Amino acid sequence: MNATMQRSAVAGRTSGKVATTARASSMARPRLPIAGRVARRSAVTVRAVAEPVVVDKAVEAPAKPVPSGGDPWEDEKWTKYKWTVYRGVAYDLTPYLDRHPGGRWLLNLAIGRDATALFESYHLRPEVAASMLKRLPVLADFPVDAVPPSPRPNDSELYNAIRERVRKEVFKGTEIKGAHRSGSEGAAFAVLGYAAAMYALYTYDANPLTGALLGLGGAWIGLTIQHCGNHGAMSTNPVVNNLMGLTNDLAGGSSLMWRYHHQVSHHIHCNDDALDEDVFSAFPMLRFDDRLPKAWYHQFQHVYMWALFPFLQLVFQIGDWQALLTNRTVGATLYGASNFERQTLIAGKLAHYFLLYGLPAFLHGPTAMLGGAAGYLFTQSIVLAATFAVSHNVPETKPLDPGPTRENLDESAVTRDWGVQQVLTSANWGGVIGNFFTGGLNLQIEHHLFPAISFMHYPAISKIVADECKQRGIPYSHYDTLPEILGRFVRYMKEVGAAPQKPVKRDGEMLMLSKF
C-alpha cells in the first residue's frame, strides 16, 4: 500500500467497512483546509528553494522566514524532523526523544500528528510538562493547517476542576515524585504469578481445561498489567512500563498496535463514530452504534455475538500482521513507530506461538495442543470481549434517543468538551474488587480521564469525579455489578441492532480521517 493510500480517508474509513455513500464520496479525494491547499500549491514551486527554519524558543532565536506549505508527511523538508503539533505550534521532538521521562515509546505516539489531547490527558501537572515544550525547537512556517486538529482537554472546565482536586485530595503533592504512577506492584505480582502457575500446569498437561485456566491468565494480563504498562502507569520507570506492556505480546496481542489504536484513536475520541476505532472495527458483523448502516441480520446480533466473541484473539492476530505490513492499524497510522518497536511485534508473536502451540505440541502431541490452545483462545477472547464491550455500549453512553450524550457527540470533535465527553461516553461498574481484577477498567470513566494514573487510585478518584459531575448536573453512569451492566449491554445490542440508521451531522469532519 503506498503512502497516499495509507493516509486516505477512504482507507481509514473502509478499514472498518462502515463508509456510507455520502461519506465515501466526500472522502474519495480528501481536500485540505483552504490554508493547507494554498500552502501545498505554493510548495510546488519553492520546495527546492529553502529549508524550514528551526527556532529554539529557549534562546528566542530570530526566525528566518521561508516559503510555507508542503505536505508534512511527504515533503523532505519536514519528514527529516520528528514533528508534532501542540495547540497550533509545530515542534521538533528529536532532541527530547531519549530524555522523555515517560520513555520514547509513549512520545513516539505524538510524532506526525496533533498530539494536544495525548499531551494534556497524560500529564497530571500540565504546566510542568508544558514548560518542557518551550525548550524544544519550533518549526517555523510549518503547514499546521494541513494537520487534523486535536481536541484540547485543558479547555474543559470539568476536567480542570477534577484534575485539581485529584492532585490536592488524592496525591497531596506527591505526584511530583511519581506517586500517581505507583501502587499497582502487588497486582502485577498477583497477575504474573497466576499466569506463570497456569502456564506450568498447561505445559504439564495440555487440555481444554488447563488451556481455559491459562486463558483466564491471558485475559487478566490484557486487562491489567499490559494495559496499565502501555499507558505508562505501572511505574515511574519507562523500562518497567515497557516490559509490562510487552506481556500483551506474550498473551497474543501486540503492545505496539495497542498503543496506537487504543490511545491515539479510542481514548482521544471515545464513541466518535468516525474516529474511535472501537465503534466501527467490528462492523459489519456487529453494529455497535445506530450511526452505522443497518443490515437485516443485526437484529439478531445480541444472540450470535456470543458465537463471534471466542474468535476475538484470532482477529487480533490477523489485524496485527496486516498493520505491520501497511503501517496502519485501525484508527491510527504508525507515524512514530520505530524499527525496534516493529521488531518487538515479530519477536512477541513468535514467542507467543512457541509458548501456546510449539512447546505443548512437542511435549504432548498436536491433538492435545489443539485442545489446550482452543481452551485458551476461547476463554481469553470471551472474557476480554465481555469486559471491554460493556464500558461504552449501554444506553447511557450511546443513547438511541436525544439527550446530553447525543448532543455532545453531534458536536465537532475539536469543539466538544473533551472532559464531559469522556464522562458521558463511559460507564462504571463494581468497586474495589472489580478494580483489582480488571486493572481499573470497571471504573472506565476515571480511566478515560486519567489513563496515565495507576488503576489502584481509581476508587478514590471516582468519588471526586462523581461529586463534580453531580454539581454540574452531568450524568455519571454506574452499575453495581458486572452481571447488571452485562445484561444491559445485551439488551442494548438488541436495541441498536434493530434501530434505524441515524444521520450523521458532521460529514465534513471526515476530512480528519485522511491523516489519522
Curated annotation (Swiss-Prot):
Q: A biological process (GO) annotation for this entry?
A: long-chain fatty acid biosynthetic process
Q: Where is this region: Disordered?
A: 1-25
The UniProt entry, under CDD domains, shows:
Delta6-FADS-like (cd03506)
Binding sites annotated in the UniProt record for heme: H100, H123
UniProt short sequence motif Histidine box-1, positions renumbered to this chain: 227-231
Q: Which reaction does it catalyse?
A: a (7Z,10Z,13Z,16Z,19Z)-docosapentaenoyl-containing glycerolipid + 2 Fe(II)-[cytochrome b5] + O2 + 2 H(+) = a (4Z,7Z,10Z,13Z,16Z,19Z)-docosahexaenoyl-containing glycerolipid + 2 Fe(III)-[cytochrome b5] + 2 H2O; a (7Z,10Z,13Z,16Z)-docosatetraenoyl-containing glycerolipid + 2 Fe(II)-[cytochrome b5] + O2 + 2 H(+) = a (4Z,7Z,10Z,13Z,16Z)-docosapentaenoyl-containing glycerolipid + 2 Fe(III)-[cytochrome b5] + 2 H2O
Please give the start and end residues of each transmembrane region: 186-206, 209-229, 305-325, 354-374, 375-395, 423-443
* PROSITE patterns per record: CYTOCHROME_B5_1 (PS00191), CYTOCHROME_B5_2 (PS50255)
| Protein name stated in the entry | Acyl-lipid (7-3)-desaturase, chloroplastic
Give the source species: Chlamydomonas reinhardtii (Chlamydomonas smithii)
Give the organism's phylogenetic lineage: Eukaryota, Viridiplantae, Chlorophyta, core chlorophytes, Chlorophyceae
